[in-house]
């Protein structure tokens, strides 16, 4: 079975919709096939994809993190011939599968008279734009997409949170824009300038945004993300209670070709707190070396002369 032989893009087999489709293709016997059919259709409907299976399957491939997408996201212009052959074969299979209609599957199914069952049917729709056209052009389009947008979940999402020892995407991030914020323009501009320097590969600093509640500290970070994510900026919120996990977090992003702000909100600077000791260790390099693709932005409304 071709889908089982995916190599570079085999990561899509772990995703919900492709996995359900794979089980349908492998189903043997009438009962197993009908169960797999019903499950696949339900999965599509739950995600609002009942009319666009091709877009879903090819989109899953577009956002897959693999040897090709990582290399392209890192700026590679040339790739090993063997890798390109693997990519070409995988994309050909994915495009063929995305074009299969319910009628195609029923024709090769173990069901004797499928028309009498009136099974629910989905629409195929069209592949994502990057996978429309000649296959070699599609590979070039995919590579360009990765160079411009990154790969994996970092291409699909802009905001993340550290939870359960892993980086998890935020599907619906705060939509605040810089133009929405009023007051403290000088201080905000300093944070903006520092962030722009970071994105341009120039020297930049970790930032502590401090002041009374309601002065726009957290909103500034969220607004900068919405302003600059097309330029490769991503934000990972790290709960202050998880600061001891900092080495684990930076290990997971060190090789990702994006720029990350590690955002720590509402810090307390009492020397008796664990967060104070943990942040001090992070900033002084006691826990892990912070990779060049990351900065720490923290906010606090508790700061005195002794901490400046």
Model-identified regions with their sequence ranges:
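Walker A/P-loop
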Residues: 206-236, 240, 249-254
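Conserved catalytic/switch belt of AAA+ P-loop NTPases
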Residues: 251-255, 270-307
